[in-house]
Amino acid sequence: MRHLSSLHRHGIPVLAPLVLLVACSSGGAGTPSAGTPDASAAAGPSADTASPSRVLDADPARLPRDREAALDLIGRVIADPDSFGPGVVRRSPYESGPATWPVLGADCAWHQEKPAGNVLATLTRSFEVPAAQGKGPVRLSAVVTVHRTREDARWEMAESIEETMRCPTQQLQEGERIGSMVSAALLGGESGQTTSEDALSESGQYSSTALGGPHAYVWQQAQSLRFTVAATGKGAEGRTEEEISDLVVQGMATMLVRIESAVEKQS
């Protein structure tokens, strides 16, 4: 995979591919890959081979205990345009309402719904690298979610893996689809994975009525304590997978560093 070298440059380890499923559809899209929540644990290293997982040493007094505090923390750690690098601007609408978050329905389409009861707060922001010099626009997004417990955050990660198995292709928004995915997962402490307790990555193909396709698609998600962060990059004509991945990795690295700074114990 061409984008993997960029992960090392930002201190995020390469994720070992779990499954590659390629399926045909009328739209030419392929199949994301994954496993069930129970299988996600089995896919990780065994107790005999795994390195100790790095867990952020947080100050309990700095962890949010209610929705107001969670929203305040999210506002301090979620990516802004500069988090992805130069040339990135806000898209409109810039932020989703904190009263909704994306849910993959039985129809394999993403919908905005009320957050689950185990979510203290969540926020999504949208960005873009404008079209220039014969290259189409790159559409980016960032999500930060604060769960009530660490276990709730870990279940969100497991459910993300299950979703890619359940839906051969996915509709992101009206006229947008993804497929032909390579999925990977890595637990904290495995293969140098020290930026979070758990990390997921997908890359594949993105098509839309507005931008055509297929183009490069990259998604990453990570979990640390009660927090999950995710970033998505959707390519366009003239944009390489490596270019999209570099943007996503930079945004993820920024958010993970900000979370650590916001909640870690201070000497």
Please report, for each region that a protein language model flagged, where it lies by residue.
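Sec-dependent bacterial lipoprotein signal peptides
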Residues: 1-22
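N-terminal low-complexity, Pro/Thr-rich disordered segments
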Residues: 18-72, 260-267
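A small/polar (G/S/T-enriched), proline-flanked helix-loop surface module common
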Residues: 52, 56-60, 88-217, 251, ...
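Extracytoplasmic/secreted envelope proteins and their assembly/folding machinery
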Residues: 71, 75-81, 154-161, 249-252, ...
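Short, well-ordered beta-strand elements
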Residues: 140-143, 226-235
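Short, surface-exposed beta-strand/loop micro-motifs that present aromatic residues
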Residues: 216-224
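A short acidic/glycine-rich loop-to-helix N-cap element
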Residues: 233-250
